[in-house]
Every structure is written in structure tokens, then in C-alpha cells.
Amino acid sequence: MKKILALTILISSSCTFAASNEGIEQGIRSYSLLHGVNTAEANKALFLEANRDSALDAIEEEFKGRIAGIYIENLPTYKIVVRVKGYGQNEKRNIVVGNAISKGDLPIDIQYGAKESREEAISQINKALKLVKNSFYTIQTVSYNEKNGNIVVEVKGKSTVENLKKVDEIQSLWNNPNLP
């Protein structure tokens, strides 16, 4: 009876391992197809993605209040790009991430020169939203693009001469000199 139980446990754990391994392989294939990279690069990218949190926490702390955006580039290789408000020497870093079994270098590009931090952008979003609400009643989305610093307010409506005049008026009232 013990042998049957041990064999059953061994078989079920083997099936679980095979299923989880199959899921990992499917993730690698999907990433490879989505981003147009080979499976080795996809495997590396997924590993870095899974182990990046502590590195991002350290970057957030180092540049506290000055980060304009953080985003991922997948081509030609996986890397994290950090846009920083103000001036400085752009730099490339490799931060070791991983676990007890495996480690890898997480490439991070620090790019200076952003005009506003995320916090300032949120304030500008609120200001823009108030102005837009005065002219349009059908706001669809409000967003901040961390890659380029653009603030976008989308409204439902047609591009009529009247609506385009409203947009020009809103931009004039908004008067944000830090727009990209």
C-alpha cells in the first residue's frame, strides 16, 4: 500500500512539474512571437522580468521625486529605461538580479532631461481634466505616457471646427510650458 501511495505521489508531482514546465515554455514562445526575439532572449527577458522588483525599488529610491517615467524596451534586448527630470550624464547600468539558483544582469538606461516628474504630471493631468470638463462632457480616457511625457485626454466627438477651437482654447488656458 505504501509503495502504491509513493508511486501515486511521484506520478502526480511529475505531472505537476511537466505542466508547470509546459507553461513556462509556452510563456517563452509567446514572448518570442510577441516581441520578435529568439527563445533564448525571451527566456532571459522573462527571468529578468520576474526578478526586477528589488532593482526598481532601488531606482525609485535613488531618484525619488525626479522620475518622469519608467518603461521597458524589448528590442534588441530586454532593458528598463528610466526617464529622470533635470540634467545629468545619461548612463547605462547593469544590476544583478535573481535568486539562489540563478542570477542575471538587468540592463537599466538612465536618461536625463525630462521636463516634469510623474508627480508634476499628475498635477497637470488634474488641471487639464478640469479645463476639458468645462468644454466637453464625454471624456473617454485620461493618461500619462511615461515613455514620452505626453498627457492625453480623449473625448468622444467629431473633429468639427467648433470642437477644434475648443481644443485650442483649452491648450491656451492650460498654458503648460513643460509639454513635450
Predicted regions and their residues:
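Short glycine/threonine-rich beta-strand-turn micro-motifs
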Residues: 29-34, 52, 62-122, 136-173
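Structural signature for extended repeat/solenoid scaffolds and their inter-repeat hinge/linker regions
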Residues: 41-45
